[in-house]
């Protein structure tokens, strides 16, 4: 089976910047939703390097996927004199939380740059938030595009390998979808479009739409209940699935779709434990597994024929935009200078 990575640069994803310029010299505080996210780890490494290149001292703080922790840490940073606050919001899409943080930062008259995780489910509402403070900005991607591209990739792959993937020869492809977080806007979009866009490709070619493996699951996905997009969640789910849905029972899950590569890794580990998707792909059945982020671990799995495909987001592009806008706001320059 052909394995591939589709690359999506931040610009191609529609890098969006919503902006509302300077503070005293000091430390720039960057509050991360979690240090445990593999993609965000690559953004953090790139952002630290980009800020250092601009002569800025950065303090990175892990919120451990806890909004109260993030709020408390940001308030502490403001009291201790941060010259700017950069926020990777824990509660994605929670406008009330974003407003609370924005007001606290605005009160200290220092720049506020939110990035990556949406501040609202409504673009107009988000725009109004940033219009309300001239020293603020949002840097992010069009959160629908990774899911759309993943879905198209899946549809094209399944169409090309339909008979090979259809293990029980029932003329349908059964799948499982692993969702990273119930409320996160990117997770919602990837869960929706990862299947819908695949179905569009398949049905246009006269093939049936994908079929969720468990007809009793109305949501048609399994979510990480901790909201951390983790390989632990997908591993546990996949282990449980394989005990009931397998080739011996004639109902094997034939396709695995994941919101990110870390969840894909967990699913692959469970499959490997059951004798599927072994390194090299020889002498075993390989269940197609798709993710998002094109992490180093995912690229290695693809090279080893254990994983099928991933969508790459541009961590460096995201980091450069955040660093440039933050440094410009601190220096009192036009926030877009250098972009």
Segments from the language model and where they lie:
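A residue-level marker of the well-folded mature domains of exported/periplasmic proteins
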Residues: 2-4, 24-339
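Sec-dependent N-terminal signal peptides of Gram-positive bacterial secreted proteins and lipoproteins
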Residues: 4-24
């Amino acid at each position: 089976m052909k394995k591939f990575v589709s690359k999506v640069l931040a610009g191609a994803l529609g890098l969006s910047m919503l902006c509302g310029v300077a503070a005293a010299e000091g430390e720039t505080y960057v509050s991360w939703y979690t240090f445990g996210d593999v993609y965000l780890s690559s953004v953090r490494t790139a952002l630290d390097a980009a800020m250092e290149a601009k002569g800025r001292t950065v303090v990175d703080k892990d919120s451990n996927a806890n909004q109260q922790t993030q709020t408390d840490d940001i308030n502490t940073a403001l009291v201790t004199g941060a010259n700017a606050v950069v926020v990777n919001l824990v509660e994605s899409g929670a406008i009330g939380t974003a407003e609370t943080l924005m007001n606290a930062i605005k009160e200290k008259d220092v720049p506020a740059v939110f990035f990556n995780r949406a501040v609202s489910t409504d673009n107009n509402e988000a725009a109004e938030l940033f219009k309300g403070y001239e020293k603020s900005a949002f840097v992010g991607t069009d959160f629908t595009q990774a899911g759309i591209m993943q879905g198209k990739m899946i549809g094209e792959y399944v169409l090309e390998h339909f008979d090979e993937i259809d293990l029980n020869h029932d003329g349908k492809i059964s799948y499982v979808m692993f969702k990273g977080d119930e409320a996160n806007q990117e997770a919602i979009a990837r869960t929706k479009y990862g299947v819908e866009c695949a179905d569009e490709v398949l049905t246009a070619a006269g093939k049936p739409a994908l079929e969720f493996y468990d007809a009793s699951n109305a949501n048609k996905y399994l979510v990480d209940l901790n909201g951390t997009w983790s390989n632990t969640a997908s591993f546990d789910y996949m282990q449980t699935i394989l005990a009931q849905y397998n080739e011996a029972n004639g109902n094997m899950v034939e396709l695995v779709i994941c919101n990110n590569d870390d969840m894909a890794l967990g699913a692959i580990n469970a499959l490997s434990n059951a004798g599927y998707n072994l390194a090299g792909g020889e002498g075993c059945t390989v269940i197609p597994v798709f993710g998002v982020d094109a992490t180093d671990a995912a690229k290695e799995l693809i090279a080893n024929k254990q994983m099928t495909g991933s969508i790459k987001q541009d961590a460096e592009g995201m980091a450069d935009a955040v660093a440039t806008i933050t440094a410009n706001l601190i220096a009192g320059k036009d926030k877009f200078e250098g972009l």
